[in-house]
């Protein structure tokens, strides 16, 4: 019987839930927002809202907190836009959003997964150099107790929020490993979430996966890319499958390291105002490049793929991307909360807006219909190469394409 499991890398972060950053975000300082056209908040609407509030207070079956109603009202204004990418963030959720995009968290540096039936929690991944790794935690360890509580009686999000709260100077865990109890004490600290993974493949081919475009992605990419070049990589595969996007600044700073001089991406708002993001072209890539994409490659990942394709510096392999060609801006409201809304469209260097369409690969390779798709690409790219290629037909084709490009260049 297949067991149902949920996983949360936020244990490292101490965040309560995973916050998907499916769109590029800008962060702006709080200021006065001009009113354009007729205001929704008038004496008439305020009076109606007050009347509804009184009816709820008097007649609703259960007691309702006024703060909860207010939060729902704010959220409703954004929900009325009918835009899945626009929304209201309470103070708590805005903090989580910011932490997610920054890629840095207060935590101990590991991911965990919980069996939804037995509630057993195991260590899924222990980040290199993290407090957890230094304390001796290993992947596969069963978390038996957290402090003085049984881990199986807690939810992953509860543990995560507890770490994030900063209420503890150190965290005591009892682990089960091969039937033996192991006690470790860990001091939470700022942990940078690893979002770039790399390795060398046979035939001097380099592989680099980008899971998400956070603030830390450009520097992590730089280190990994430089290391692959030191190992004499003659070609490079950049894997963007299942990458939901992230920060516009992050993807631009990453592309700056491989593109020639020219346009990376530009945006236009409803008034026709255009903002361009360009590359100086100081370090254009000089080896053959393959970019691996799928239907879950979205937003900033599509900016990356679109720029590579339009500049003709690489070959796209996989399936058509998600098709998110719009940009959101986040406005802090001064009290810790914020609103995020769609403010512009983005265009690839050749002037293409891919919203609702996606980017088609140069070489299409669909995942087998009779085979489950991996939740995380890193579940496969840490396998021995031969086993990996046997399980991953898209990666296998990428290696074939890249090998051909390298051979062609060497002629």
Predicted segments with their positions:
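Acidic surface patches and DE-rich sequence motifs
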Residues: 115, 269-271, 333, 348
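Structural motif
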Residues: 140-142, 337
């Amino acid at each position: 019987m297949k067991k149902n499991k949920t996983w949360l890398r936020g244990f490292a972060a101490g965040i309560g839930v995973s916050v998907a950053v499916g769109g590029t975000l800008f962060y702006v300082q709080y200021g006065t927002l001009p009113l354009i056209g007729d205001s929704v908040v008038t004496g008439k609407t305020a009076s109606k809202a007050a009347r509804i509030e009184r009816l709820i207070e008097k007649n609703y079956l259960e007691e309702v907190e006024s703060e909860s109603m207010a939060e729902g009202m704010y959220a409703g204004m954004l929900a009325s836009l009918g835009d899945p990418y626009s929304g209201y963030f309470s103070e708590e959720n805005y903090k989580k959003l910011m932490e997610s995009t920054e890629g840095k968290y207060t935590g101990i540096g590991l991911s965990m997964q919980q069996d939804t039936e037995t509630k057993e929690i195991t260590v899924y991944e222990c980040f290199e150099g993290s407090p957890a790794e230094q304390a001796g935690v290993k992947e596969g360890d069963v978390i038996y107790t957290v402090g003085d509580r049984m881990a199986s009686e807690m939810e992953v999000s509860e543990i995560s929020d507890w770490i994030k709260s900063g209420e503890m100077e150190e965290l005591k865990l009892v682990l089960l490993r091969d039937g033996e109890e192991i006690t470790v004490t860990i001091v939470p600290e700022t942990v940078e979430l690893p979002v770039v993974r790399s390795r060398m493949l046979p035939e001097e081919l380099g592989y680099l996966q980008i899971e998400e475009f956070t603030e830390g992605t450009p520097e992590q990419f730089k280190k990994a890319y430089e290391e692959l070049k030191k190992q004499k990589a003659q070609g490079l595969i950049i894997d963007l499958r299942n990458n939901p996007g992230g920060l516009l600044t992050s993807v631009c700073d990453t592309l700056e390291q491989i593109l020639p001089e020219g346009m990376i991406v530009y945006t236009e708002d409803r008034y026709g105002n255009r903002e361009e993001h360009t590359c100086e072209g100081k370090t254009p890539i000089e080896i053959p490049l393959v970019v691996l994409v799928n239907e879950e490659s979205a937003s900033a990942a599509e900016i990356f793929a679109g720029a590579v394709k339009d500049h003709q510096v690489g070959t796209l392999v996989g399936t058509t991307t998600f098709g998110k060609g719009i940009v959101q801006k986040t406005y802090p409201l001064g009290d810790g909360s914020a609103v995020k809304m769609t403010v512009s469209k983005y265009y690839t260097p050749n002037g293409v807006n891919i919203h609702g369409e996606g980017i088609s690969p140069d070489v299409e390779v669909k995942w087998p219909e009779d085979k489950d798709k991996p939740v995380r690409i890193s579940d496969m790219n840490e396998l021995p190469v031969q086993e990996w290629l046997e399980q991953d037909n898209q990666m296998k084709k990428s290696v074939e394409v890249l090998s051909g490009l390298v051979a062609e260049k060497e002629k």
